[in-house]
Protein backbone atom coordinates (compact mmCIF):
# COMPACT_ATOMS: atom_id res chain seq x y z
CA UNK A 1 0.00 0.00 0.00
CA UNK A 2 2.84 2.41 0.89
CA UNK A 3 4.50 1.63 -2.46
CA UNK A 4 1.23 2.32 -4.33
CA UNK A 5 0.78 5.61 -2.47
CA UNK A 6 4.37 6.61 -3.35
CA UNK A 7 3.74 5.74 -6.98
CA UNK A 8 0.55 7.83 -7.02
CA UNK A 9 2.36 10.79 -5.43
CA UNK A 10 5.19 10.54 -7.99
CA UNK A 11 2.67 10.39 -10.85
CA UNK A 12 0.76 13.39 -9.51
CA UNK A 13 3.98 15.35 -9.09
CA UNK A 14 5.01 14.51 -12.67
CA UNK A 15 1.62 15.60 -14.01
CA UNK A 16 1.80 18.84 -12.01
CA UNK A 17 5.26 19.61 -13.41
CA UNK A 18 4.06 18.92 -16.95
CA UNK A 19 1.17 21.37 -16.51
CA UNK A 20 3.24 24.16 -14.94
CA UNK A 21 5.25 24.81 -18.05
CA UNK A 22 8.52 23.50 -16.71
CA UNK A 23 10.94 23.58 -19.64
CA UNK A 24 11.25 20.38 -21.63
CA UNK A 25 14.01 19.42 -24.01
CA UNK A 26 12.02 21.13 -26.80
CA UNK A 27 12.21 24.50 -25.05
CA UNK A 28 14.55 27.17 -26.25
CA UNK A 29 14.32 29.57 -29.12
CA UNK A 30 11.58 28.73 -31.59
CA UNK A 31 10.10 30.95 -34.25
CA UNK A 32 6.97 30.03 -36.16
CA UNK A 33 6.64 30.89 -39.83
CA UNK A 34 3.44 29.65 -41.41
CA UNK A 35 3.68 28.80 -45.09
CA UNK A 36 0.91 28.53 -47.66
CA UNK A 37 1.34 26.71 -50.97
CA UNK A 38 -0.39 28.75 -53.69
CA UNK A 39 -0.31 29.63 -57.39
CA UNK A 40 -1.19 33.25 -56.50
CA UNK A 41 2.20 34.67 -55.48
CA UNK A 42 1.77 38.01 -57.27
CA UNK A 43 -1.79 38.59 -56.02
CA UNK A 44 -0.73 37.56 -52.52
CA UNK A 45 2.24 39.92 -52.53
CA UNK A 46 0.10 42.82 -53.74
CA UNK A 47 -2.59 42.14 -51.11
CA UNK A 48 -0.31 41.81 -48.09
CA UNK A 49 1.93 44.75 -49.05
CA UNK A 50 -0.72 47.23 -50.21
CA UNK A 51 -3.63 46.29 -47.94
CA UNK A 52 -1.84 45.29 -44.74
CA UNK A 53 1.50 47.10 -45.11
CA UNK A 54 3.67 43.98 -44.95
CA UNK A 55 7.20 44.12 -46.32
CA UNK A 56 9.06 41.65 -48.50
CA UNK A 57 11.82 39.82 -46.61
CA UNK A 58 12.77 37.61 -49.56
CA UNK A 59 11.35 36.49 -52.88
CA UNK A 60 12.29 34.53 -55.94
CA UNK A 61 10.31 32.91 -58.77
CA UNK A 62 8.73 30.25 -56.50
CA UNK A 63 8.88 31.60 -52.93
CA UNK A 64 7.69 34.74 -51.15
CA UNK A 65 8.56 35.62 -47.55
CA UNK A 66 6.69 38.58 -46.08
CA UNK A 67 7.01 40.32 -42.72
CA UNK A 68 4.57 42.34 -40.64
CA UNK A 69 5.04 46.12 -40.68
CA UNK A 70 6.98 45.98 -37.39
CA UNK A 71 9.17 43.15 -38.74
CA UNK A 72 8.40 40.82 -35.84
CA UNK A 73 6.49 38.09 -37.65
CA UNK A 74 6.68 36.44 -41.05
CA UNK A 75 4.54 34.37 -43.37
CA UNK A 76 5.65 32.58 -46.52
CA UNK A 77 4.03 31.51 -49.76
CA UNK A 78 5.31 28.81 -52.10
CA UNK A 79 4.35 27.74 -55.62
CA UNK A 80 2.91 24.21 -55.73
CA UNK A 81 4.74 21.36 -57.42
CA UNK A 82 8.03 23.22 -57.61
CA UNK A 83 10.90 20.83 -58.53
CA UNK A 84 13.18 22.36 -55.87
CA UNK A 85 10.80 21.24 -53.12
CA UNK A 86 10.08 17.82 -51.66
CA UNK A 87 6.68 16.23 -52.39
CA UNK A 88 5.44 17.12 -48.90
CA UNK A 89 5.39 20.77 -50.01
CA UNK A 90 3.82 20.28 -53.46
CA UNK A 91 0.08 20.24 -52.80
CA UNK A 92 -1.67 23.62 -53.07
CA UNK A 93 -3.83 25.10 -50.34
CA UNK A 94 -7.51 24.20 -50.92
CA UNK A 95 -9.10 27.46 -49.65
CA UNK A 96 -10.52 25.99 -46.46
CA UNK A 97 -9.61 25.24 -42.89
CA UNK A 98 -7.09 28.03 -42.33
CA UNK A 99 -7.27 31.50 -40.81
CA UNK A 100 -4.79 34.06 -39.56
CA UNK A 101 -5.17 36.33 -36.57
CA UNK A 102 -3.32 39.63 -36.61
CA UNK A 103 -3.26 41.46 -33.30
CA UNK A 104 -3.21 45.24 -33.70
CA UNK A 105 -3.19 48.23 -31.35
CA UNK A 106 -6.04 50.15 -32.98
CA UNK A 107 -8.48 47.84 -34.75
CA UNK A 108 -10.99 50.65 -35.39
CA UNK A 109 -8.37 52.73 -37.19
CA UNK A 110 -7.36 49.81 -39.40
CA UNK A 111 -10.99 48.95 -40.06
CA UNK A 112 -11.69 52.48 -41.33
CA UNK A 113 -8.47 52.58 -43.40
CA UNK A 114 -9.32 49.30 -45.13
CA UNK A 115 -12.90 50.40 -45.82
CA UNK A 116 -11.53 53.60 -47.42
CA UNK A 117 -9.28 51.42 -49.62
CA UNK A 118 -12.35 49.47 -50.72
CA UNK A 119 -11.27 46.20 -49.08
CA UNK A 120 -14.23 43.86 -48.68
CA UNK A 121 -15.02 43.28 -45.02
CA UNK A 122 -16.12 39.66 -44.48
CA UNK A 123 -17.10 40.07 -40.81
CA UNK A 124 -18.00 43.57 -39.69
CA UNK A 125 -16.30 45.10 -36.67
CA UNK A 126 -17.69 43.84 -33.39
CA UNK A 127 -17.04 43.34 -29.69
CA UNK A 128 -16.97 39.86 -28.22
CA UNK A 129 -17.94 38.86 -24.68
CA UNK A 130 -14.42 37.51 -24.06
CA UNK A 131 -12.84 40.91 -24.66
CA UNK A 132 -11.85 41.02 -28.34
CA UNK A 133 -12.81 43.78 -30.74
CA UNK A 134 -12.27 42.55 -34.26
CA UNK A 135 -13.27 42.27 -37.90
CA UNK A 136 -12.24 39.94 -40.71
CA UNK A 137 -11.14 40.15 -44.32
CA UNK A 138 -10.03 37.51 -46.81
CA UNK A 139 -6.79 37.26 -48.77
CA UNK A 140 -6.59 36.24 -52.47
CA UNK A 141 -6.08 32.60 -51.43
CA UNK A 142 -9.34 32.44 -49.48
CA UNK A 143 -7.62 32.70 -46.10
CA UNK A 144 -9.68 34.49 -43.47
CA UNK A 145 -7.75 37.20 -41.66
CA UNK A 146 -9.08 38.25 -38.27
CA UNK A 147 -7.77 41.65 -37.18
CA UNK A 148 -8.07 41.95 -33.41
CA UNK A 149 -7.50 44.32 -30.52
CA UNK A 150 -7.74 42.73 -27.10
CA UNK A 151 -9.80 45.03 -24.91
CA UNK A 152 -9.86 45.16 -21.14
CA UNK A 153 -12.74 43.38 -19.50
Q: Where do the language-model regions lie?
A:
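Bacterial Sec-dependent N-terminal signal peptides
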Residues: 1-24
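Mature N-terminal segment immediately following signal peptide/propeptide cleavage
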Residues: 32-39, 45
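Short, conserved charged micro-motifs
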Residues: 43, 107-111
Amino acid sequence: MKRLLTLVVVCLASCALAQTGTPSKLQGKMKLNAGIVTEKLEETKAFYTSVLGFGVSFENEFYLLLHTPNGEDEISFLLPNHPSQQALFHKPFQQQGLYLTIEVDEVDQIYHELKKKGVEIEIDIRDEAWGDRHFAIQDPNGIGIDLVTHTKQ
